UniProtKB/Swiss-Prot annotation:
Keywords, sorted A to Z: mRNA processing, mRNA splicing, Nucleus, Phosphoprotein, Repeat, RNA-binding, Transcription, Transcription regulation, Ubl conjugation
Places the protein is found: Nucleus
GO molecular function, one term: RNA binding
Ranges annotated as biased composition (Basic residues): 60-90
Family: Belongs to the splicing factor SR family.
Species this protein is from: Homo sapiens (Human)
Annotated protein name in UniProt: Probable RNA-binding protein 23
Record domain RRM: where: 166-243, 263-341
Membrane-spanning segments: none
Domain of life: Eukaryota
NCBIfam families assigned to the protein according to its UniProt record, in alphabetical order: SF-CC1 (TIGR01622)
Length: 439
């Protein structure tokens, strides 16, 4: 056997198992495609068809089946895709569905919706309150819902003094306190008109003090009775307002500093022959004088020994007060003091040394001088003289307050003011004293 033939035999032997498997697979496929009756009919008709034609038909059928399967697979995919789209279209929002509406529908119904919106806006503006002071926005962001701020009680035409009388001063307050807390706390004793918490100018933190003003003055003592009660865990202190005293102190301070404006001085212990022109010549070098009034007796026209001088500038009046108080004029030391007008219409006179005005031209002034000299020398005056000096001081106070003029008090009146004692009193004589007639 030749080598070529041997190779062919070996190759056929190696391919034989594979050919058997292919033949068996082809038979199985033919059996599946053709049922038993078909196979029997074909066997009866004879062996007219060849094996090659049978294999070709089988391959065609395979290709048709694969095409059908791929087509079915595509159809199923398209069905799944359509089902997914339909499901998503159902879950879409109504707003997105409205986008697919036709333009004709929008043109037809757009004007109606716009007119409806305009009517709704007009209705809302009509119902909503107008923007004005006293309203503030609440927690809602809508401008149609506003929270009214607490309405402050209307203020009558009250003077500052009357408002101060209805105000209390609160101390020792908690740092986190608010005006609403104080209003709720004091509303138990009366209607609160205003609350002011004093805060630091730089840090804006509360200083722990506040002013509370009531509508009725009867609520002030009740509010003061709340002292010691705890507000936000801290015992509160309530006092009457010191605003009037603070105002007067500020006015006096302004006068001392010389902040513009007129100032009135009292000039006393004058000789009876001193005239207004003499006083003007003495006081005018210190500044411009607006008015000089020398008090005189209405019957005799004689000077009473005191008067009032008004300077146009308080600084000039202050210098005159410092320089001329105690200045000796016609043998008498002048008494110069500052005049303060009181709310009741009276006047208060204060001197730099704190002494009261002594008028040596009257009996009361001489009594007071005697008491002052005796006190400085350590001599005890008799009880009658001490009582007379006290009565003279009382009369001088009445005269300074404007209640009773000192000239209207005669010695009999001074005697009536002193207590009547039936005991003998000690007396002493003073000699070498000047008299008004010898001046």
């Amino acid at each position: 056997m030749a080598s070529d033939d041997f190779d062919i035999v070996i190759e056929a032997m190696l391919e034989a198992p594979y050919k058997k498997e292919e033949d068996e697979q082809q038979r199985k496929e033919v059996k599946k495609d053709y049922p038993s009756n078909t196979t029997s009919s074909t066997s009866n008709s004879g062996n007219e068809t060849s094996g090659s034609s049978t294999i070709g038909e089988t391959s065609k059928k395979k290709r048709s089946r694969s095409h059908n399967k791929s087509r079915d697979r595509k159809r199923s995919r398209s069905r799944d895709r359509d089902r997914y789209r339909r499901r998503n279209s159902r879950s879409r929002s109504p707003g997105r569905q409205c986008r697919h509406r036709s333009r004709s529908w929008d043109r037809r119904h757009g004007s109606e919706s716009r007119s409806r919106d305009h009517r709704r806006e007009d209705r809302v503006h009509y119902r909503s309150p107008p923007l004005a002071t006293g309203y503030r926005y609440g927690h809602s962001k809508s401008p149609h819902f506003r929270e009214k701020s607490p309405v402050r009680e209307p203020v009558d035409n009250l003077s500052p003094e009357e408002r101060d009388a209805r105000t209390v001063f609160c101390m020792q307050l908690a740092a986190r306190i608010r005006p609403r807390d104080l209003e709720d706390f004091f509303s138990a004793v009366g209607k609160v008109r205003d609350v002011r918490i004093i805060s630091d100018r730089n840090s804006r933190r509360s200083k722990g003090i506040a002013y509370v003003e009531f509508c009725e003055i009867q609520s002030v003592p009740l509010a003061i009775g709340l002292t010691g009660q705890r507000l936000l865990g801290v015992p509160i202190i309530v006092q009457a307002s010191q605003a009037e005293k603070n105002r007067l102190a500020a006015m006096a301070n302004n006068l001392q500093k010389g902040n513009g404006g007129p100032m009135r001085l009292y000039v006393g212990s004058l000789h009876f022959n001193i005239t207004e022109d003499m006083l003007r010549g003495i006081f005018e070098p210190f500044g411009k004088i607006d008015n000089i009034v020398l008090m005189k007796d209405s019957d005799t026209g004689r000077s009473k020994g005191y008067g009032f001088i008004t300077f146009s500038d308080s600084e000039c009046a202050r210098r005159a007060l410092e320089q001329l108080n105690g200045f000796e004029l016609a043998g008498r030391p002048m008494r110069v003091g500052h005049v303060t007008e009181r709310l009741d219409g009276g006047t208060d006179i204060t001197f730099p040394d704190g002494d009261q005005e002594l008028d040596l031209g009257s009996a009361g002034g001489r009594f007071q001088l005697m008491a002052k000299l005796a006190e400085g020398a350590g001599i005890q005056l008799p009880s009658t003289a001490a009582a007379a000096a006290a009565a003279a001081a009382q009369a001088a106070a009445l005269q300074l307050n404007g209640a009773v003029p000192l000239g209207a008090l005669n010695p009999a009146a001074l005697t009536a003011l002193s207590p009547a004692l039936n005991l003998a009193s000690q007396c002493f004589q003073l000699s070498s004293l000047f008299t008004p007639q010898t001046m």
